[in-house]
Amino acid sequence: MSERCVLHEFSASGNCYKVRLTAALLGIPLERREYDIMKGETRTPEFLKNVNANGRIPVIEIGERFIPESNAACYYIADGSSLIPTERFAHADMLRWMFWEQYNHEPNLATLRFWMRWVGTDNLSEMQRLQLTPKRTAGNSALKLMDDHLSEKE
C-alpha cells in the first residue's frame, strides 16, 4: 500500500488495535490521530462532518477518503497481501470469521472490557449491571468456539 494512511483512533480500543496490528504485520506505516472517546471527541460537529458521521472509531483516512469500521479498515490495509486468502472458499471463510468476531466477540467481550476499564463497576447503570452475566456467558462461549476452532489448525 503506497498511499499515506491515517488512523483516527482511541489507542486503548481493541478495534483500533486490530487496525494497528494488521498494518504492523505488513510493515505499513500509519499516521495516528488520537481521540478521547470519554470526552466526546468523536461526537463533535467537526468529527461527524469530516471523519465519520457515525461518530465511531477506528477510521482510516486514505487521501481524502475515509473507511470506518475496524474490519473494513483491516481488509483495506491487507488486501493483496498474504493475510487475505486468494482461494475463494478460504477468502469467504476469512470474511466469516471477521463478521463473526463483530457479532459475537465485540458486543460481549469488548463491551465488558470497556465497562470494567473505563466506566467502572460502580458507575454502571442498572441495565448494564443486568447484562454483566449474560455478556460474560456469551463471551466465554465465543472464546471457547475460537479455541476449539484454533485447536484444529496448525
Regions found by a protein language model. Name each.
Residues 131-150:
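Amphipathic alpha-helical packing segments from all-alpha helical-bundle domains
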Residues 1-131:
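GST-like domain detector, emphasizing the conserved glutathione-binding G-site
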Residues 16, 91, 142-145, 154:
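Secondary-structure boundary/capping motif
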